[in-house]
């Protein structure tokens, strides 16, 4: 085979591989339904490519020490599907780290914890900074560290799939 033909064949193979990989990438809407696991608390999640770390609407945040380690207790308050009284669940998690967030009102130190979240059929263990997001439209914000495990975000779509991690959570 001539060198020019070999290069063309190699280029065509790479182009084909690239196209097939691109087609296999999952696309998600900029708003998706999610479950906080293992409690299966339903929450709307905003997929935000502008944020690095994911954030969770946490109320009554109480930091404490447990066996010499930093822990946090907090409430997650979410509306129910039937729009009746919201449901509140208390979580306790080990603090993985603290992040400092600077804004117009000054700086703020927030705890970061690991949480399991279900999106579509994917069960992910991700890091979330805790903050009272009660004045925000979406209680869960998924940043780039989480989005890299999902796929591309299509800003023209919302609610592309329902959470289906029930069987996965039992494992």
Task: For each feature predicted by the language model, list its residue ranges.
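Bacterial N-terminal signal peptides that target proteins for export
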Residues: 2-10
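N-terminal signal peptide c-region/cleavage motif recognized by signal peptidases
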Residues: 18-20
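Pepsin/retropepsin-fold aspartyl endopeptidases
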Residues: 23-171
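General helical structural elements
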Residues: 11-12, 148
